[in-house]
Amino acid sequence: MTLAEIQKAITENKEVRWMNDGYKVYQDSIGQYLITFIENDYTIGLTHQNGLTLNGNEQDFYIK
């Protein structure tokens, strides 16, 4: 999924995951797109600081 596809899916309230179902991709209450590992709450931004480059490969993001 591209960044635009991920953001659209989240806006449509779809469950987006990265790599496996343990990594949830979502938008927080202040508008940041994040990836959180559910088991330990470790969280990173969806993108690098430039806001364009994904923290992961496009093919590893999917809708659950």
Locate each region found by the language model.
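N-terminal acidic leader/helix
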Residues: 2-26
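Intrinsically disordered, low-complexity segments enriched in glycine/proline and serine/threonine
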Residues: 8-10, 30, 52, 61-62
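Short, surface-exposed beta-strand/loop "edge" segments at domain boundaries and coil↔beta transitions
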Residues: 23-26, 40-47
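Short, compositionally biased
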Residues: 28-39
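Intrinsically disordered, low-complexity, charged/polar segments
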Residues: 43-64
